[in-house]
UniProtKB/Swiss-Prot annotation:
Membership in a protein family: Belongs to the universal ribosomal protein uL14 family.
The keyword RNA-binding belongs to this UniProt entry's keyword annotation: yes
Signal sequence coordinates: none
Subunit details: Part of the 50S ribosomal subunit. Forms a cluster with proteins L3 and L19. In the 70S ribosome, L14 and L19 interact and together make contacts with the 16S rRNA in bridges B5 and B8.
Protein name stated in the entry: Large ribosomal subunit protein uL14
Lineage: Bacteria, Pseudomonadati, Pseudomonadota, Gammaproteobacteria, Chromatiales
Organism whose genome encodes this protein: Nitrosococcus oceani (strain ATCC 19707 / BCRC 17464 / JCM 30415 / NCIMB 11848 / C-107)
A matching Pfam family: Ribosomal_L14
Keywords: Ribonucleoprotein, Ribosomal protein, RNA-binding, rRNA-binding
CC per GO annotation: cytosolic large ribosomal subunit
Length: 122
């Protein structure tokens, strides 16, 4: 579960290191976001010569959460960190590589580009 002010890690090679959620998209009263949801993030820390700079605001897709995701068979998949992939205004990934595993739920959400770039799909 991601909400405003949640600290996040970047799971791509866009150049961002640390991000913070500034808005959960999808309605004015929506408080939490989970895997497969799109949020607004601000870059808090970035590497030099990266595609993104500190202070910039982007859309981001949540790919891993510590809360995890519950499957229909009752299993629960949890991760060690909260990670996102930065997206441009057309909701295409900014980076060209994805680091770490992603879940099958992204396939249902029609983010096939991110699923195909990921090294492992759980």
């Amino acid at each position: 579960m991601i909400q405003m002010q949640t600290s996040l890690e970047a799971a791509d090679n866009s150049g961002a290191r640390r991000l913070v959620c500034i808005k959960v998209l999808g309605g004015s009263q929506r408080r939490y976001a989970g895997i497969g949801d799109i949020i607004k993030v601000a870059v808090k820390e970035a590497i030099p010569r990266g595609k993104v700079k500190k202070g910039e605001v982007y859309n981001a897709l949540i790919v891993r959460t510590r809360k995890g995701v519950r499957r229909a068979d009752g299993s629960l998949i949890r991760f060690d960190n909260n990670a996102v992939v930065l997206l441009n205004n057309q909701l295409q990934p900014i980076g060209t590589r994805i680091f770490g595993p992603v879940t099958r739920e992204l396939r249902v959400e029609n983010f096939m580009r991110i699923v195909s770039l990921a090294p492992e799909v759980l």
